[in-house]
A protein has these predicted regions:
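Beta-sheet repeat architectures centered on beta-propellers
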Residues: 1-134, 264-279, 284-528
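Beta-propeller and closely related beta-sheet repeat lectin domains
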Residues: 77, 128-130, 180, 187, ...
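Short beta-strand motif characteristic of blades in beta-propeller domains
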Residues: 91-94, 138-140, 188-193, 237-242, ...
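Surface-exposed loop/turn positions within WD40 beta-propeller blades
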Residues: 96-99, 143-144, 153, 194-195, ...
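Surface-exposed extracellular loop regions of Gram-negative outer-membrane beta-barrel proteins
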Residues: 100, 238-263
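Surface-exposed loop and turn segments in beta-propeller and other repeat-based domains
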Residues: 119-120, 163-173, 211-223, 304-323
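Asp-box/WD-like beta-propeller blade repeats and closely related beta-sheet repeat scaffolds
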Residues: 152-181
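Carboxylate/His-rich catalytic cores and anion/metal-binding grooves
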Residues: 177, 181-207
Length: 528
């Protein structure tokens, strides 16, 4: 007994292990790398394409020699955007084996200015702006050293490092104030170290030792019974995180501040949280999940569901000694709405893995790149940093190194591993004509990973190779550029199987794909 069926899928998804699918409604993947989802604008579809890499913006050629702005013995630990009197400025924190440094970088002119030298080596970096209008202050800390930097001119002149004589980094008990997690809340600078959370005098981010019980603007500190891991302003209060729990510190007219009861959601480290959309997302290593604080109707918060169940396999690879290397970033640009988690899970130390939550489509994908330490938005553009400063989504390579892409589809078995499936017609892909669509497809049949898989190179027969490099120009009145809505159809190999795992991948330079639909026509299902 047999039957014939067919389907066409317009909707690709990300990594799904909890509710995976290979059906007409959606095709998900068990794993992927350097691919992204996009709206095809056809039939409410979501397509699949290889993602772009990055380029170094801290190097340039001079007399056929490659020159780097960053000294050869230093690595970039932190990237910061500070706005000084309306002017956006780029700050880099670097470390060598012996010292840390702060630089102001002007990308347009390949200029780098040393701001602070001989800082302690900690491998950490945090910073924030204290905006006052008449004097905007950028405050930096690496956990040991705290520096205040500002500009007194709207012109693009060198920044000024505040004199230590004007800074009172001792608290009301004469203890030194230092630590991480710098944030601004209630017009004060907040900073934590261990179980102590300090706050500056209101309106004065440089003073921590002014105390007067009759003055509500006084500086002070709050001591907790557990170590603090992160802090973040949320809903008119300050969210204070521990490893496995959190509390809200709220304003109080009588006592200045008061604490709510503990919530079960904790945060792994001071950069493992980010505000995106209307929610505060944070990675809890004790639960190996990404949770969020969500605002409910009455204005209170509630703990959201774990959105990272499908990538728990990757999160289990995070070593407890590397927790402080996690970086979370809200990425909202012209064509992106994502939450990035830079996680120390790569088995190869020369590479890094970014787990990306596609906020619009509610899907996870993975990005593999050269080793980086930080990610940041500067002037509405996405940057990363390691040995150099990189601008993302600008190239087919990662600073001239090719790193392959793949999309390993969820296994197709039509709800049964015991029936034989025969493709009477080759499966077909509709691909975007603006891409090269030169890639490989791999078939693994019946879960047999010991047998060599069937691999075939796919080459689209579009006209892109003819007129791609003419995009944006008109050489005569008859010239018409091939629009992105033009599609081409490529055929995949036919196959006979009980269960089939399909993988699309690239393995050499100038390979890429952009898939709109996958169609399987006349699939015969036979009882055996």
């Amino acid at each position: 007994m047999s039957s014939i069926t067919s389907f066409i899928n317009h909707n690709f998804g990300g990594i799904r292990r909890k509710d995976s699918a290979f059906a007409e409604q959606k095709i998900t993947c068990s794993d992927c790398q350097n691919v992204e989802l996009y709206y095809t604008e056809l039939n409410s579809g979501v397509g699949l394409r290889t993602s772009k890499g990055n380029i170094s913006v801290s190097t340039y050629h001079q007399d056929q020699e490659l020159i780097s702005l960053i000294p050869s013995d230093e690595n970039i630990i932190g990237i910061f955007e500070t706005v000084q009197l309306g002017v956006k400025r780029l700050i880099l924190y670097t470390e060598s084996e012996t010292k840390g440094r702060l630089y102001n970088v002007i990308l347009d002119s390949y200029t780098i200015n040393l701001l602070v030298d001989d800082l302690n080596v900690t491998g950490e970096a945090t910073g924030c702006d204290f905006t006052q209008g008449w004097l905007d202050m950028f405050i930096f800390s690496n956990g040991k050293d705290i520096k205040y930097i500002y500009s007194n001119s709207e012109a693009y002149k060198e920044l000024i490092v505040e004199s230590e004589n004007n800074i009172k980094l001792i608290d009301t008990e004469n203890r030194p104030v230092s630590g991480l997690g710098l944030v601004i809340f209630d017009s004060r600078l907040w900073i934590f170290d261990g179980k102590v959370l300090w706050y500056s005098q209101q309106g004065e981010c440089r003073v921590f030792n002014y105390a007067d019980p009759e003055v509500v603007t006084s500086s002070g500190y709050i001591e907790f019974v557990k170590d603090i891991t992160a802090i973040y302003p949320y809903l008119g209060s300050l969210a204070v995180f521990h490893k496995d729990s959190s509390v809200l510190v709220q304003l109080d007219s009588q006592t200045g501040f008061k604490q709510d009861e503990e919530s079960p959601g904790g945060c792994a480290s001071h950069k493992a949280l980010v505000f995106h959309g209307t929610d505060l997302y944070f990675y809890d290593d004790t639960k190996k999940g990404v949770f969020s604080f969500q605002q409910i109707i009455n204005g209170d918060k509630t703990l959201g569901d774990n959105i990272a169940l499908d990538i728990q396999k990757e999160l289990m690879l995070i070593d407890s000694d590397d927790i402080d290397k996690i970086r979370a970033l809200s990425v909202v640009t012209e064509d992106r709405n994502e939450v990035w988690f830079l996680c120390p899970i790569s088995e190869e130390k020369e590479y890094s893995i970014v787990l990306i939550f596609d906020y619009l489509r509610g899907e996870w994908v993975k990005r593999k790149c050269q080793h980086i330490n930080d990610i940041q938005i500067f002037d509405n553009e996405l940057y990363s940093a390691g040995k150099e400063l990189y601008k993302e989504y600008m190239s087919d390579t990662f600073d001239e190194e090719f790193i392959g892409a793949f999309y390993q589809c969820t296994v197709i078995n039509m709800d049964s591993d015991n029936t034989l499936k025969i493709t009477k017609m080759p499966p077909r892909l509709s691909v975007d004509g603006e891409y090269r669509n030169n890639f490989y497809v791999k078939y693994v049949k019946n879960y047999n990973t010991l047998k060599p898989p069937k691999i075939k190179e796919i080459k689209s027969k579009t006209k892109k190779g003819i007129i791609y490099y003419d995009k944006g120009y008109r050489y005569d009145s008859g010239y018409i550029y091939l629009p992105s809505v033009v599609t081409s159809v490529v055929r995949l190999p036919s196959s006979t199987f009980k269960a089939l795992e399909i993988t699309f991948f690239t393995e050499k330079l100038r390979q890429e794909f952009c898939i709109k639909t996958l169609e399987i026509s006349k699939l015969k299902i036979k009882q055996v």
